[in-house]
Amino acid sequence: MIRSVLSLAAVATCAIGVVAHADVEDAQRVTHEHMRAFANPSGYAATYSSAGFIDTANPFFQSLGSNGRSCASCHQQSEGWTVTPEGVQKRFHASHGTDPIFRLNDGANSPLADVSTLAARREAYSMLLSKGLIRVGIGIPENAEFELLKVDDPYGYASAKELSLFRRPLPTTNLKFLSTVMWDARETFKDPASRDCLAGTTSCFASVHFDLADQSNAATAGHAQAAQPLTSAQRESIVTFELGLFTAQVTDHAAGRLTALHARGGPQHAAQQTFYFGINDVLAGDYRTHAAFTPLAFNLFDAWANPPAERDDGHERVEARRAVARGQALFNTKPIQITRVKGLNDDLHLPVIQGSCTSCHDATNAGNHSVPAPLDIGLTDKARRTADMPLYTLRHKLTAELIETTDPGRALLTGKWQDVGRFKGPVLRGLAARAPYFHNGSAKDLNEVVDFYNQRFGVGLSPVEKADLVAFLRAL
């Protein structure tokens, strides 16, 4: 078996960006042969593998289709196991737009785009190059409660048969924490024999291992254009590899080592974090312990609330650590009046819900929902549409109600009107490595993420509170 183990010194040489010598030393102190670290705008992120190494002989890294792609084509370790615009642009420049990620089936804005010249390829792959977006093609279900009334597609391709949906590739790391696979949950399967059931219902779900095995095959058939399905052994190998990966920030330019002074940042602590279906569920409480939901879902940086200074720490580093701790406290407890969220307010028949960030990011120290709960928080509304995004006008077949959206989300799987615009919330670890954010890449950085929620829910954050929240999020 081939083992790919790079020392931090080797990785630091080729990692993106230029960082201060002290940052490299900090990263060296918290990484070893089981982890690989890569620079990002906030510091360093690292991946820990429970197998003890990154096995580059795994089928994950092999071309198993007909177009040269592997899973790693769209899931780069150096980019948080997804892709970033900067990384995609480097590949375009190095290959003149012929790297396997640049394929018409889903890398281009339209599968009919002209790619005959370098300039044409740059135009054809503009969404991938500018926002790291892959085009997903899904049609309106025949039995849908709605119909497609109008299409405004700047690339002239989308129709009711196949809408063009531009989405970010989700990271293939920290998958231990998943309750839902894919943005629209299309790889999240029901299993009546399962014990993982929504509280008080008979809605039970297959294991994430099962979901990921199916997803690996579907991705190879679609993205890699494979003629034959993966073997059971290939699926199992890919899923086992993915489930052993844990990625998180290990150093921050301002706060330093994220394990200093008993803080519990970094991927090794993530690997040790308990997770199960229904842990700390916001609606039903903890499914196993039966404890009530606690908004204190994150406690990684409790020790930094009033940290002492280490030997070489200056005032700025101590203050940076306090900012991270304050941001964590804000994320846990800052009051938010949750309104107009489909999947929450409408399902519970409550126009206003008093909550906090962890009302929708309840999984302990992971930040996603611990049960399947796709929500519509307004990211696909016409008001947020940019000129490079298609816009779809949907009409309810019975009521004639209209919705204008850039992506109907889960509704294209269920056909249900109430599911228009619903998406899952992702795991929040390793955020600093993988801008832009949201399913459609509409937030270029974490400042824009915080601004969106502050404006959407009228949170009333002060400039200091915004900065503290960003400091916390980039430390994850």
What does each model-found stretch correspond to?
Residues 1-4:
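Positively charged n-region of N-terminal signal peptides that target proteins for export
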Residues 7-17:
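Bacterial N-terminal signal peptides
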Residues 22-476:
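Periplasmic c-type cytochrome electron-transfer domains
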